[in-house]
Regions:
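ER/Golgi luminal nucleotide-sugar-dependent glycosyltransferases, focusing on the catalytic module
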Residues: 1-116
Length: 116
């Protein structure tokens, strides 16, 4: 069976952004309570991060501080390829909220032609 995991790209630069990643995490847990989550931190201000939340509220979740600061959009793909934590990944930013269950299943992928 194919294992689906989630990757959240996080960059906390103020208190609102700290709330965003937590809400993003909670939305995933609402619909996918047992799936693994990898949070990739891209050079956040750790003075603004709620460490109690990180240490006590996260389940089946790993937080990874990126060694490549400021690389943003490339980091989830790099670490997914490098770590292979799960078979299939849903990659989102820390301000994206999943509001319903998504059917990630597919029997095949057929590329479509692009007309110019």
């Amino acid at each position: 069976m194919t294992e689906l995991g989630f990757i959240i790209l996080r960059h906390v630069k103020d208190k609102n952004f700290n709330k965003y990643w937590q809400k993003s995490y909670e939305c995933i847990r609402k619909f996918y309570p047992e799936n693994k989550i990898l949070i990739i931190d891209d050079n956040s201000n750790y003075d603004l991060i709620d460490t109690f939340y990180e240490n006590h509220k996260l389940y089946k979740t790993k937080i990874l501080r990126s060694e490549y600061k400021g690389r943003g959009e490339l980091l989830p793909y790099y670490y997914f390829n490098r770590l292979r934590c799960f078979d299939v990944a849903c990659i989102i930013h820390d301000n994206v909220f999943i509001n319903k269950n998504i059917d990630f299943s597919t029997t095949y992928f057929v590329p479509t032609a692009v007309e110019l």
